[in-house]
Amino acid sequence: MSNSLVLVINSGSSSLKFALIDTVSGEATLNGIGECFGLADANVSWKIDGKKHEFQLSDNGNHHKQAIDRIVALLEEQGIKQDIVAVGHRVVHGGEKFTQTVKIDETVLQEIENLSDLAPLHNPAHVVGMRAAIAAFPALSQYAVFDTAFHQTMPAKAFTGAISSKLYDDYGIRRYGFHGTSHYFVSREAAKVINKPIEKSSFISVHLGNGASVCAIKDGQSVDTSMGFTPLSGLMMGTRCGDLDPGIIEFLLKKGWSTEQVFKELNSNSGFLGVSGLTSDCRGVIEAMEEGHAGATLAFEIFTYRVAKYIASYMVALDELDGIIFTGGIGENSLPIRRQILKSLKIFGYREDEVANADARFGKGGVITQANTPIAMVIPTNEEWVIAKESMALLHA
């Protein structure tokens, strides 16, 4: 059995995703998810050889620990637990403290927890998952890989807000950016597509999913990105509003809304869901648009317009542009979304290759623009592979 297996864990407040990655092939030996933590129907499901299995968790305790325990049992049943050499954890927010992958110890756990003010929905849940994994795999080295780390190369003009420097000095208020592992991975894969060294390339990476962000990447490094202090800013998303005049927050507070109500509205009831009035799922919005639903049509138009606008604005961060990269669940699979974004960029010479664009879906990538026109391409992301590779590299450092 391979000695290159890394267990990758992404622990959220009410869920826990996991995958067993072979760092040589990049393939997931198995993957699954624990869902509905804190509810009566909490469960863990996984796929092996294309077949889905499910296990109901009990309602009498810590669902993160129960999920990890079930994963351990699953690995033992498959006879592969002993072949795992490390555990890698996704961490949403590393602030300015963590600029690269680190080995997890008690000090690191405390520092991640101390950053919870910057990611209150994510970092505490990461620590819960890490502690459960450490208890389950005490002999294995475990590593934290940060979404924000890739963006620590942004220049001050890109990450600094036009506010008093005291707010940055006292509270660390600045642009941090997210989806870093995804932007990192697809930019390296895109450089291979155009046969150019990553150190001499320039891309605009467009990660579109329920969460979405754009990143300008110069010579392999992030130089600007659309998400900011939190993952709420930037593009319109599944349930998040994206960029919004902050004066609206004061307006709603004066109208009697509580702070919690305002931010629940902006985080959970906006985006595709809020504008369409139907769903946060892009596929459902497009289906309704095709049936003539006005709210769905407007949601589609706002989303694609804002993505194109961000892409255009990030051209000024680069000396040249080798390609636009579409990735993430929507970016990899939604033909109508990509088509409309490219139409919006026609002033820059982008022309869709309809056959190639239709073909680049469901795990298949490639260039989707016509020959002799600026390049746009689809690159399926693989964040788990990045986390596994980063963990393996540090293990052998």
UniProtKB/Swiss-Prot annotation:
One of its GO terms (molecular function) is ATP binding. PROSITE patterns: ACETATE_KINASE_1, ACETATE_KINASE_2. Mg(2+). Can also accept Mn(2+). It catalyses: acetate + ATP = acetyl phosphate + ADP. Keywords: ATP-binding, Cytoplasm, Kinase, Magnesium, Metal-binding, Nucleotide-binding, Transferase. The active site is at D147. Mg(2+) binds at N10, E383. Its EC number is 2.7.2.1. Pathway: Metabolic intermediate biosynthesis; acetyl-CoA biosynthesis; acetyl-CoA from acetate: step 1/2. Its cofactor is Mg(2+); Mn(2+). Substrate binds at R90. The record marks H179, R240 as: Transition state stabilizer. It comes from the Bacteria. One of its GO terms (biological process) is acetyl-CoA biosynthetic process. GO terms for cellular component: cytosol. It is an enzyme of class 2 (transferase). It is found in: Cytoplasm. Pfam families: Acetate_kinase. ATP binds at K17, H207, L208, G209, N210, G211, D281, C282, R283, G329, I330, G331, E332, N333. PANTHER family: ACETATE KINASE. Homodimer. Belongs to the acetokinase family. Catalyzes the formation of acetyl phosphate from acetate and ATP. Can also catalyze the reverse reaction. This is Acetate kinase 2. It comes from Photobacterium profundum (strain SS9). The lineage of its organism: Bacteria, Pseudomonadati, Pseudomonadota, Gammaproteobacteria, Vibrionales.
